Curated annotation (Swiss-Prot):
SUPFAM superfamilies: CarD-like, P-loop containing nucleoside triphosphate hydrolases, TRCF domain-like. GO terms for biological process: regulation of DNA-templated transcription; transcription-coupled nucleotide-excision repair, DNA damage recognition. GO terms for molecular function: ATP binding; damaged DNA binding; DNA helicase activity; hydrolase activity. Residues 633-794 form the Helicase ATP-binding domain. InterPro entries: CarD-like/TRCF_RID, CarD-like/TRCF_RID_sf, DEAD/DEAH_box_helicase_dom, Helicase_ATP-bd, Helicase_C-like, Mfd, MFD_D3, P-loop_NTPase. Its main location: cytoplasm. This is Transcription-repair-coupling factor. Residues 808-969 form the Helicase C-terminal domain. Couples transcription and DNA repair by recognizing RNA polymerase (RNAP) stalled at DNA lesions. Mediates ATP-dependent release of RNAP and its truncated transcript from the DNA, and recruitment of nucleotide excision repair machinery to the damaged site. It comes from the Bacteria. A motif (DEEQ box) lies at residues 747-750. Its EC number is 3.6.4.-. One of its GO terms (cellular component) is cytoplasm.
Length: 1168
């Protein structure tokens, strides 16, 4: 974008602006948003000061940020995102926005140069005093001395929580001389101390808990918007007590008890740990002199204001909203007199003392003394939308008028394509700038702005893809923490005390922890399991592979088995029979597929390439991969049967559309089968819009079509006139004949009935089939399904998705009203989820009284199909503002304009349901809001409480997400294998079921488990060899290390585990050293065919297998073991060698030496 700033910099108009910008009060009029951004960015580039850009709301701030990222390095661009919503302070919010706010405040506190975008309510928000924030900025360097207690205390003040193992943002832990911290910004950090001196600082991976790179120094930012020290707490106690005493007599007697509960709920008097998320509601009482963000800026900062009049309007409504919100919470006993979240001074008063530059599109009167007014003439660019003739004549006009023409396109490919297009129009163009650009020609560069603009006085026009082809702007990515779904799902298998487990031989029990027991004078660790009644089982940790966490559907509580009974054997036999039947079916399908002959497509045509380039968005890597996989399938002679898995709105439709286009280009017909009329309509509209410039005949068959239209479509399918037909189960009726069906696309197959599924099967015969589903399919099942059905997965969301802002809060009509008004004021729509059909109409009346001007509709499952569809369609077409609905909206409907979801009694829903419902909003480039309400002061059941806790962590990083993924995975497994299997999965747990299914499939396919060359080794030594609690206190970590030791087969793995132990827990004690020695002995034994090493008191018995005995070179062995002298005796028993070793001092070292010698004496067999 340098070309653009160069042209602007040289212009006289800009130079006039530049002289007064930041020097005196100035009004700049006439500039469109993108032109304004270009000027502001250039001013910033030329100055050495901080620049503050104030907008009226967060939505506007986001839009300007996207454009500014084209000119300014992301490292220097900061935003202070505060939602335009009071309720925010009362709910648990996602860490994304908070980490952006903290990044901004930290940069300001450090006096960094930057361009800072702040919406009005961010400007007015009460904050921690600047000096206190500055005192809590910590930079740690290797070699420095630190006071550990003081340091940990500071972390707590900054909002960090102490845990035994760090796994989430905002946690820290202390183990021996190792401090782990997971800050909101940057990588998790591990600090190793030598006494009080910092010995090393390393990044570490929270999933593996292993260190990565060493760093010399690190900044530790706060984990909360507010710093809360002991002094703050004592000030807060006094202030809150006074506020409580002031408020109590002034409110209605009926709510005084509620006020008392609210007062006590802050636990200021009995707790030593304070939850920052809750205490920030009391910010008005926290500090003697709170700051606003303006106090964080340098005294010479430059201030730019975007649309003053809009800001004043927002300020008015913000003040009214804030007043009414505070009155409501005081009247209902949820708040105190004096409580506030924003400074009530006028916006102008806040920025007093700074020279301000006001940008306004139109000339306007302002109650401000202005020193300068600068007027620009700026015109919008004609929207061409691909109309070649208009484009040519407009470009010709620019050339004739000697304009500098800057064309912005988003990818390198499009640069070439655009240049070819302009050369056809005889418009001179260049793509690289060698010297300064001459007027009367176009320069085509990679870049993107939200819109183009024309500045006639400068002789400059900027044209973007939006005007050229109607495409949407690609949202710039800022730094985000990437977390793969595999990692998200991994940790649900962590064992916590109280979890249900499945023991392969004993069935379902409960995990009670790891216990160290003394058996025959030696200490060992055992896993303690509780079974039915008082039965308990202690499983040695080296047999822990027989124990798995019980994972099943969310609401499924398994019953415990009895130890020693036959019940578990029967259950397992039943499941075994069922998986064998499925394996049989799968294998038949597999054989059938391998033998089938289908149509083999050729490589992509030129039309296909053009069609794909027309897609206005950038493909995500997963989409691109899925498309390649599908095309590869189509280009083989074997018919395709592929399942495409991807969350709602992750772009499965575009993948399907490209496959459909490929089929049509080779003269084949496509049938697109969907479960509901509305979905059919939506897919039909998408296809029409995507293929409008190509000769493709698309028809719809659903209840929205007249009998006459349906008849014509049937005729067209028969003659081949219709290329693509989209429809509901009507497509499955017997009287439909295709001339040449090549591709069948089925959306959400599991939602069709049994009869329809049978019919789909017959349609599938020798035709390529692509099935789409939004329910994730578990990876473990992918394995056993491989070769039976191919699978593509889309796990990355499209670029311009904002994460849905999730709030969990108590049910309160003033919160609800605010949320509804907020969405309707931005012309959006609301889903109001109320799951009680009997009183759903009363709920609608209640909302109507709250929002008299809103159009409110009701949708529930007891309505006739037709009524329901018509209501939904009217809602999609924007005829209603609010839809009060049951969970019927959980699946499939796409309403991009509905971006607020309110769920009453969220504690009654399953997490996976909430996760899917939340996917209904945030489907466009606007921020989506989800409010999960739970009844006030209601005693929640334990599960509901856990569930709400999990929902609170429901942002991408939370465990709630993992549980939802787990439950959906199980649902996906049920869909894939049939309903009755769901029950079997619940009886034995998901992992054991998957394992049994995989074994059965492999057996049927004749794939034998590779029989281990070496038999299992039993090592039994009377030694204290375990992981003491003093060394590793966290049980999950302990189990994890034991699992690794159990799976160790090489010396590299042993070295790796030793490194990990020192890295995570510091130097290990003698018991751990012995444990590692035993594992080392076991590895030697594995490699040399030893089957048993047994401690018999004074001697150690060693047995080799017959095969190992044949392979051993006796001469080499005797020579090598001479140092052992007479302590070693060799014998033969049943053709197998036995060795006894007499125990002496340092016998463990002798044993290690002996097994190493045995391994080195093995002859390498010929096959190797």
């Amino acid at each position: 974008m340098t070309i653009l700033t160069t042209l602007i910099k040289e212009d006289n108009h800009f130079q006039d602006l530049n002289q007064v910008f930041g020097q005196a009060n100035t009004l700049v009029t006439g500039l469109s948003p993108s032109a304004k951004v270009t000027m502001i960015a250039e001013k910033y580039a030329q100055s050495n000061q901080q620049l503050l850009l104030i907008t009226n709301n967060l939505y506007q701030a986001d839009k300007l940020e996207t454009d500014l990222l084209q000119f300014i390095d992301a490292e220097e661009l900061y935003k202070y995102p505060v939602q335009d919503i009071m309720t925010e302070e009362f709910s648990t919010q996602s860490p994304q926005l908070m980490s952006e706010r903290i990044r901004t405040l930290t940069a300001l506190a450090q006096g960094k140069k930057g361009l800072f975008i702040v919406p009005l309510n961010g400007l007015k928000k009460w904050l921690t005093p600047v000096e206190m924030w500055q005192n809590h900025q910590m930079t740690l360097r290797v070699g420095e001395d630190i006071d550990v207690d003081q340091f940990l205390n500071k972390l707590v003040n900054m909002g960090y929580k102490r845990e035994s193992v760090v796994s989430h943002i905002g946690e820290f832990s202390l183990r021996g001389g190792i401090i782990d911290i997971f800050p909101l910004i940057g990588e998790p950090i591990r600090i190793e101390l030598f006494d009080t001196k910092i010995d090393s600082i390393r990044d570490f991976d929270v999933e593996t808990q292993r260190s990565k790179d060493n760093v010399e120094e690190v900044d530790i930012t706060t984990a909360s918007d507010y710093i809360i020290t002991e002094e703050v707490i004592s000030h807060l106690k006094e202030e809150l007590k006074t506020a409580y005493e002031n408020t109590r007599p002034k409110i209605d007697k009926s709510v005084r008890n509620d006020l008392k509960e609210t007062y006590e709920s802050f636990k200021l008097f009995e707790s030593t740990y304070f939850d920052h998320q809750i205490l920030r509601r009391l910010v008005a009482f926290m500090y003697e002199t709170p700051s606003t963000i303006i106090e964080y800026f340098q005294k010479d900062a430059i201030i730019a204001v975007d649309e003053f009049n809009r800001i004043k309007e927002t300020e008015e409504s913000l003040t009214v909203e804030s007043d009414s919100f505070i009155s409501n919470i005081i009247e209902s006993g949820n708040g105190f007199i004096g409580q506030s979240f924003i400074k009530y001074d006028d916006f102008e008063t806040l920025i007093e003392g700074y020279p301000v530059t006001y940008f306004s599109l139109f000339a306007t009167t302002m109650p401000i003394k202005l020193n300068h007014i600068i007027k620009f003439s700026c015109k919008p660019v004609q929207q061409f939308y691909g109309q070649y003739d208009i484009m040519r004549s407009e470009f010709q006009r620019y050339v004739n008028q000697n304009y500098h023409i800057v064309v912005l396109v988003e990818t390198e490919t499009k640069v070439e394509r655009m240049q070819a297009m302009l050369s056809e129009m005889h418009i001179p163009s260049i793509t690289k700038l060698h010297r300064s650009m001459s007027s009367g020609q176009a320069v085509i560069i990679e870049g993107s702005l939200s819109e183009g603009f024309e500045l006639p006085d400068m002789g400059l026009v900027v044209i973007t893809e939006r005007e050229l082809f109607k495409s949407k702007q690609k949202k710039q990515r800022k730094r985000t923490k990437a977390i793969s779904n595999a990692e998200k799902i991994k940790s649900y298998q962590d064992l916590n005390v109280g979890d249900y487990i499945v023991h392969v031989h004993h069935g379902v029990g409960r995990y009670l922890g790891v216990e160290t027991l003394e058996v025959g004078q030696t200490h060992r660790d055992y896993i303690k399991l509780q079974y039915k009644g008082t039965d308990q089982l202690f499983v040695p940790v080296d047999q822990m592979d027989q124990v798995q966490k019980y994972v099943a559907s969310e609401d499924k509580t398994p019953k415990l088995n009895k130890l020693g009974g036959s019940e578990w054997k029967k259950t397992k036999a039943k499941v075994q029979q069922s998986v064998e039947d499925i394996a049989e079916e799968l294998i038949d399908l597999y054989k059938e597929r391998e033998m089938a002959e289908g149509y083999q497509y050729g490589e992509d045509t030129a039309e296909q390439t053009t069609f794909e380039l027309d897609f206005p968005y950038e493909l995500t890597p997963d989409q691109a991969k899925s498309i390649d996989e599908i095309k590869d399938d189509m280009q083989k002679s074997r018919p395709m049967d592929r399942l495409l898995c991807g969350d709602v709105g992750y772009g499965k439709t575009e993948v399907a559309v490209r496959a459909a286009f490929k089929a049509v280009m080779e003269g084949k017909q496509v049938a697109f089968l969907v479960p509901t009329t509305i979905l059919a309509q939506q897919h039909y509209e998408t296809l029409i819009e995507r293929m409008q410039d190509f000769p493709v005949e698309i028809q719809l068959m659903s209840r929205f079509r007249t009998p006459k239209e349906i008849k014509q479509t049937k005729e067209g399918l028969k003659t081949g006139f219709v290329d693509i037909v989209v429809g509901t189960h009507k497509l499955l009726s017997k009287d439909i004949q295709y001339k040449d069906l090549g591709l069948l696309i089925v959306d959400e197959e599991q939602r069709f009935g049994v009869r329809h599924k049978e019919r789909i099967k017959t349609l599938k015969h020798n035709v390529d089939v692509l099935t789409l589903t939004a329910t994730p399919i578990p990876r473990t099942l992918h394995m056993s399904m491989l070769g039976v059905r191919d699978l593509s997965v889309i796990e990355t969301p499209p670029e311009n998705r904002f994460p849905v802002q999730t709030y969990v809060l108590e049910q309160n009509m003033s919160f609800i009203k605010e949320a509804l008004e907020r969405e309707l004021s931005r012309d959006g729509q609301v889903f109001y989820l109320y799951n009680k059909v009997q009183s759903i109409y009363e709920k609608r009346e209640q909302l109507q009284m709250l929002m008299p001007d809103a159009n409110i509709a009701v949708a529930h499952g007891q309505m006739t199909e037709r009524d329901l569809e018509e209501t939904m369609l009217s809602f999609i077409n924007n005829e209603y503002d609010i839809l009060v609905t049951t969970t019927i909206i959980e699946t499939g409907v796409d309403v991009p304009n509905a971006n607020t979801l309110i769920i009453e009694d969220a504690d009654r829903f399953g997490l996976s349901q909430l996760y899917q419902l939340r996917g209904r909003v945030g489907r466009s480039s606007r921020i989506g809001y989800a409010y999960f309400l739970h009844p006030a002061n209601k005693v929640l059941t334990e599960t509901a409480e856990d569930r709400l806790q999990a929902i609170k962590e429901f942002t991408e990083l939370g465990s709630g997400f993992k549980i939802a993924m787990r439950d959906l995975n199980i649902r996906g497994a049920g869909n894939l294998l049939g309903k009755q299997q769901h029950g079997f999965i619940d009886t034995v747990g998901f992992d054991l079921y998957s394992q049994m299914l995989e074994e059965a499939v492999n057996e049927k396919r004749g794939i034998k488990e590779p029989e281990s060359e070496v038999p299992e080794v039993e090592v039994d030594l009377n030694l204290d060899a375990y992981l003491p609690t003093e060394y590793i206190a966290n049980e999950q970590a302990k189990i994890e290390i034991y699992k690794k030791l159990r799976k160790t087969e090489t010396f590299d793995q042993i070295i790796d585990i030793k490194d990990e132990l020192i890295d995570r827990f510091n130097d290990y004690p003698v018991e751990v050293a012995r444990l590692l020695d035993i594992v080392e002995i076991k590895v030697h034994a594995l490699h040399s065919g030893i089957t048993l090493i047994k401690d018999k008191g004074k001697i150690i018995d060693i047995h080799l297998s017959v095969k190992a005995t044949e392979n051993i070179d006796g001469e080499v062995l005797f020579k090598a073991t001479q140092p052992l002298g007479r302590t070693m005796k060799v014998g033969v028993q049943n053709n197998a060698m036995t060795i006894t070793l007499t125990k002496q001092n340092q016998w463990l070292d002798s044993l290690k030496f002996l097994v190493k010698c045995i391994e080195e004496s093995m002859r390498i067999s010929d096959e190797a």
